[in-house]
From Swiss-Prot:
The gene is trpA. The active site is at residues 50, 61. It catalyses: (1S,2R)-1-C-(indol-3-yl)glycerol 3-phosphate + L-serine = D-glyceraldehyde 3-phosphate + L-tryptophan + H2O. HAMAP family: Trp_synth_alpha (MF_00131). Pathway: Amino-acid biosynthesis; L-tryptophan biosynthesis; L-tryptophan from chorismate: step 5/5. Keywords: Amino-acid biosynthesis, Aromatic amino acid biosynthesis, Lyase, Tryptophan biosynthesis. It is an enzyme of class 4 (lyase). InterPro entries: Aldolase_TIM (IPR013785), RibuloseP-bd_barrel (IPR011060), Trp_synthase_suA (IPR002028). SUPFAM superfamilies: Ribulose-phoshate binding barrel (SSF51366). This is Tryptophan synthase alpha chain. Pfam families: Trp_syntA.
Amino acid sequence: MNRIDLSFNKVKEENRKALIPFVTCGADFTVEETADLIVSLEKEGATIVEIGVPFRDPLADGPVIQNAYTKALQNGTKVKDVFRCVELIRGKSEVPIVLMVYFNVVYFTGVENFLRIAAKSGVDGLIVPDVPLEERGDLDKICEDNCIYLIPLVARTSKDRIAAITKGAKGFVYCVSTNGTTGERKTLDSGTHEYLEEVRKNVDIPMCIGFGISSKEVVKEVKDYCDGVIVGSAIVKRMAEGKEAVIDFVKDLSDGLK
């Protein structure tokens, strides 16, 4: 069974919600430091960890993550370094790892080659924000062949479109809380709860909400409408402050989910 499924089964048994921090690799932390951080985050309540693969033109991301990617690339971070980070994590932990990666990175590595290395490294899921539904078929098949879940991103759209995007999804559905890029927001857009309820009608796997989840207060606001929360920019911003700042923030978020 995929580690993502095992983790959601566990949080369900414990009657709690999943906490999914997003981290970057090679910007403020070295590969080794990133791996150590992720192992520590699991101990502090992280259910799954999402790792962003640096890219020069991350259109779905806001300035905090864009700047982290730029710094990582300037530091010489490559795709192979992200895979090495996952391998280091696997030496110490079975926490599920999901890569957030733009398709150009996958394409230039070679789709089959990328997925093969990802599986060998210990990756459990893939989020590819710039691949539309109509072009997902081949990638979905190669992911399946490598026992990696292709996690769908679902934005606020028509009921028919939501149904099409989530059809056959595995692992969890990534619900985008707001139209636009990633980034911290003090409150969520109006209609978020209704949107999540519409997604819920179409899926029988966990739903997690991301984009704009920035504080314990926002976590408390949405936790009753989803199965987990994904926190990105607020984590990456604290990575620039050091490991303890990230750990303390994740502890606080975890408390908000109880």
